[in-house]
Amino acid sequence: MDAFNKEQKDKLQLKAVYELKPGGELPDVVLAEQRTLAGLKRHGSLKPVAFADGDRLPQKFRDADLSWYGVFYDPIVFLVNQQYARTVGQANICSWQDLAGKEQLRIALENLSDSNSTQNFLAGLADRFGEDESLEYLGSINRFIGQYSKFPFTPVRMAAVGDADVAITRQSYVFKYLENKFPAYVVYPKEGTPVNLFCVGLFKNTADDLQGLKVMEWLMTSEQVQAIAQENATGYLFLFPRGFDEAAADAEKIWLNSSYLEPVKQDGLTNKWLSKVRFSK
């Protein structure tokens, strides 16, 4: 926000609102995770808007009814303990199938029923492979998981200190720790990976569509936004990683939760994971 406000030189100023209070005044622009935007759309809170920059996004990264547009994403990655990698070879820890094919492996993973983020991971796999195949895969690595973690940073700590060989986690959880002497490193699964997609949209009550669009376009196209994200070690990756004038990221390797955005559908999938994987006999 500070960067945008300095650039505007008092012509248009942004103020952050981090929580929507019942009966409170709605902001003009919303930047949030895809499930939040999908919920706002279901409740009729967003205003469809078409603009040229939005049309450049691959279709899977924008709402079919023009209610929201993707900006950046937080991918699921492997955090691999350095000592373990030296034992088995880095070339043997590159894919989802590499994990399932191991005879011995200690995996650290957050409980997949605890949060929107973990449920998106579960849903992203199911959207990519189908429910049966994704649950079968998670069942195949379940034997490597001693206990599902309650807190998101626990898997990171376990991989770093050697209590786990591999952590399956969000890049945003680990990026700030990645220094030369950090005892673990990040792997992007070569097949692709589930992500949390962060999107931008206009609230229905916005007083000025053009000013709102200016903010949306800045988020999507400004190289300064990417630079700020990198400087602050957010771990977020942008849909136009080499700049808005270059090609978009490979959509085939970015797995979205597209079919489980409604709570009842997500809860159904989560309950299947609980019964068929975590607490299976």
Model-predicted segments: where are they?
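A structural signal for short loop-to-beta-strand junctions that line the ligand-binding cleft
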Residues: 25-29, 47-78, 96-97, 108
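Short beta-strand->loop
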Residues: 64-71, 80-82, 87-89, 102-129, ...
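Periplasmic-binding protein-like
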Residues: 56-60, 74, 107-113, 137-142, 148-149, 219-242, ...
